[in-house]
Amino acid sequence: MDKSKQMNINNLSNIPEVIDPGITIPIYEEEYENNGESNSQLQQQPQKLGSYRSRAGKFSNTLSNLLPSISAKLHHSKKNSHGKNGAEFSSSNNSSQSTVASKTPRASPSRSKMMESSIDGVTMDRPGSLTPPQDMEKLVHFPDSSNNFLIPAPRGSSDSFNLPHQISRTRNNTMSSQITSISSIAPKPRTSSGIWSSNASANDPMQQHLLQQLQPTTSNNTTNSNTLNDYSTKTAYFDNMVSTSGSQMADNKMNTNNLAIPNSVWSNTRQRSQSNASSIYTDAPLYEQPARASISSHYTIPTQESPLIADEIDPQSINWVTMDPTVPSINQISNLLPTNTISISNVFPLQHQQPQLNNAINLTSTSLATLCSKYGEVISARTLRNLNMALVEFSSVESAVKALDSLQGKEVSMIGAPSKISFAKILPMHQQPPQFLLNSQGLPLGLENNNLQPQPLLQEQLFNGAVTFQQQGNVSIPVFNQQSQQSQHQNHSSGSAGFSNVLHGYNNNNSMHGNNNNSANEKEQCPFPLPPPNVNEKEDLLREIIELFEANSDEYQINSLIKKSLNHKGTSDTQNFGPLPEPLSGREFDPPKLRELRKSIDSNAFSDLEIEQLAIAMLDELPELSSDYLGNTIVQKLFEHSSDIIKDIMLRKTSKYLTSMGVHKNGTWACQKMITMAHTPRQIMQVTQGVKDYCTPLINDQFGNYVIQCVLKFGFPWNQFIFESIIANFWVIVQNRYGARAVRACLEAHDIVTPEQSIVLSAMIVTYAEYLSTNSNGALLVTWFLDTSVLPNRHSILAPRLTKRIVELCGHRLASLTILKVLNYRGDDNARKIILDSLFGNVNAHDSSPPKELTKLLCETNYGPTFVHKVLAMPLLEDDLRAHIIKQVRKVLTDSTQIQPSRRLLEEVGLASPSSTHNKTKQQQQQHHNSSISHMFATPDTSGQHMRGLSVSSVKSGGSKHTTMNTTTTNGSSASTLSPGQPLNANSNSSMGYFSYPGVFPVSGFSGNASNGYAMNNDDLSSQFDMLNFNNGTRLSLPQLSLTNHNNTTMELVNNVGSSQPHTNNNNNNNNTNYNDDNTVFETLTLHSAN
């Protein structure tokens, strides 16, 4: 650059510049030279003031919003320094006013100019300086002069020489601020050619000058005490900032209300508004709460009450690695530093080793968590399916190291199978087992005299009280007991007692009261050991029941179905849904293209030939697209418009993925469409081959059961595999919510299911009837068999199966409904006779003693006596049979002393008087009622009874309070009997209940004797409405406006009040009402005058 150009650049401060379109703003600037002059020379330079107007439309709205605020702050700084008398600034560097540099290169393509808003120590009112017009101050509102916007908080000598964050104008919480809230992110440093660039680097001479002046002697009294802590410029984490600049905040208590991202100290950015847009720091609202002013700067992780436990999870469902060489290669890692997670090999399910706990869920992982809890806090414990591997995650690495050293080589899960402990890492995701032989005391052999047999570490957790069980339906959920985990390694001698507590809930004799913590609303536990025997053990019984049906069926098909069911090779794992399609690295049909294709197909823009061409083009991505949100709709259209040949090609590509597709919320629609559109034998065969091996998990799935019902429509023999799978895994399916309903749907499809298939399934229901009747889902099939099935003699065939466990079933609340359904069936008296004879004995046998089953049932305190009472209340019982049952029940109740019979049963058999028991109960309730509401009325009398206050309810039911007419006896005095017409002294101390007898009025507060009335408390106002009383004792008869007097007539009452006949009148509102209470009516009476 030549000399002339340099001269022009040096004189640029005298030239008006473009500031903001359409706004006149005073700009205070000072020109600096870049030749290294001293501070004294800088302070002696005059300050120029310029005010210019320009209009241009090339600046953005953001720039327009910034400039007025900056100008206002600069102008306010000038006014603050001038004062009212226009005094000059002090030129000393120790001034109480701080300086803030704002280097602002101007918008010029060929030059850049350094501007400063204000410099301390430079006078403003020198000759030749420009003075802004007075009306400029009216453009913006300036705050109080005590608010020094550009003066930072005081700094100490030990503070670092880093300029604080500039706090610029807060953005309004408007719609535009919410839409563009991301604009608060600091921009990258611009070059000097930018209009509004960031501040200069610290190496700039101007910044060096400013850093020397940032040592004020006084502090700002208006410093904001916002509790939001400053974020370091080197890291986005808050805790790191505390160590670097903690002294600065502690000594000076600076206002660092800045949410700018790191490395934005020199940026001229705005504050983020409080909007719904994504925040830079997710913890910003946490620090903005005023109530958290004294919160610690360190983040704390809340402690879990119990660890995360899960048994037999899919190893592919989590992302994990370990140094154990026995795991699959994809989960192996050669070198891994100590982590907070360990892997334990040779971990076998405890449910297989403990038959009495086979219905417990998450048992192994719970026991594993209790075992490892003594080494530290356990976050999660998981066992992996088919790997005999467990992953235990601790809260710290030290706990994991301690557990690894202690458990290495120990027999954790099974004796003779030492476990290998290795470090692991859980990465985030974008033969018949041996049974215990019980002795006479009910304890396992070897536990006598506290001589414990060798047990693996996991099984010890079951016996030392660290794990308790809660029954949820037919499964037991182990509960992590944190109180016992502290002393579990000290009390090894308590194993026998703990084992007896575990077995207590599974003993048949104590099954009903072994779990006292369960509420009445929870599902009842099955009284039989679960799971039931396999169908292989019930084959003979199954064939016997089929013969009892005596139905015309093909015996060959029945035998073939049973034989194939016994040799069924399909999976019984309800979580195995077959292979998944391989994920595609790059998809040709992305969502935008799929959306366009669907629009074109829906608008009939493609012909069938073009759709078939599209199907061939999408063939490689077809399995993946079938489970896509948009792709499954395209696949459905392809199967609707393609020919059989194209459908064969597509089914060949997708058939092996039908199971995994059918259980997906999107893929199930494409899967059902494929099955529905399959018509040719080749297509049907491909569909059945795809779902045959995974029928059981499909039936038990909420989406997959609809897939099975679609396959059912293929008919015999294509749907034969469905019945084979149901018979082979009968209990696994029928106890499931979806499985039981899917089986019922198969039985109700009369036009599709063959008689042989229906007969075999019906025989399976009878075979497992005692188990099904105790399960809420299985009971649906028993109900179908009794109510819907058309097989002859089905009740008589089912009754013998129920009588073998009659006591347990009748004492079970749910199972007893099945028994009552058989007893109330009118079309089969033989079934009713079988059940009643098993409970109460044969009615024709003379002097027969009650069966043992009846004694056991009446001793069952849960539901047994209630069931017997319901049997006696059946309307179908003949008189002689009812008398026989009552006789047997009376004999058992009188002979046994251990039975606690219910009141209703005692009344039913005549051992208790219904009236006496009823009256006694009523009196108890009445006494309790009187004592509970006595404080609500006036001062009670000696009897403790009170009158009913006059209200709508008391007028309509005045005699509803069941109190006697006898006075209450106190201090041994006898009670006098009162008749309705007997005169009563008003001064009598006796009290009487409020009854609406004809001719008797409650009188209170009168002098003298009151005839034809009875005493009442002063809180009753009924006398105010019945009569008028004069001071001379005369009582004037008034027509009573009651609900029963329409004509306002009076009736003469002589001596016998009871001779009045009840009658019905109409009131003035024409309501036909007769209010009778205890054979009395409201009557209109005439009271004779005392004169």
Swiss-Prot record:
GO terms for molecular function: mRNA 3'-UTR AU-rich region binding; mRNA binding. The modification Phosphothreonine is found at T131. InterPro entries: ARM-like (IPR011989), ARM-type_fold (IPR016024), Nucleotide-bd_a/b_plait_sf (IPR012677), PUM-HD (IPR033133), Pumilio_domain_protein (IPR052645), Pumilio_RNA-bd_rpt (IPR001313), RBD_domain_sf (IPR035979), RRM_dom (IPR000504). Gene3D superfamilies: 3.30.70.330, Leucine-rich Repeat Variant. Keywords: Phosphoprotein, Repeat, RNA-binding. CDD domains: RRM_ScJSN1_like. Pumilio repeats lie at residues 617-652, 653-689, 690-724, 725-760, 801-837. The modification Phosphoserine is found at S129, S160, S168, S913. Residues 340-426 form the RRM domain. Pfam families: PUF, RRM_1. Residues 99-111, 568-577 have a biased composition (Polar residues). Residues 482-494, 507-520, 915-935, 951-979 have a biased composition (Low complexity). SUPFAM superfamilies: ARM repeat, RNA-binding domain, RBD. One of its GO terms (cellular component) is cytoplasm. PROSITE patterns: PUM (PS50302), PUM_HD (PS50303), RRM (PS50102). Present with 784 molecules/cell in log phase SD medium. This is Protein JSN1. The gene is JSN1.
